[in-house]
Amino acid sequence: MLTPINQLLKNPNDIPDVPRATAEYLQVRFNYAYLEASGHIGLMRANGCSEAHILGFIQGLQYASNVIDEIELRKEQLRDDGED
């Protein structure tokens, strides 16, 4: 098993710091509205990507966006637990 994966499995609360500006930037880049407005979805269609492929891509980005949300939430929970 890859070392980073093993590390995360053994230490699920060892959450990296993600600067707010970085998180916000990635959230925008992973957003469907941005992808459509920037022409990325149209470019994928023009390059012959199937709708299933495009949907899978969008779902993958949504998953990545959810991971960023989870990082922020878990960091907040750990901070709150430390204040008790």
From Swiss-Prot:
Pfam families documented for this protein: T7-like_Y65
Top-level taxon in the UniProt lineage: Viruses
Name of the protein in its database record: Protein 6.5
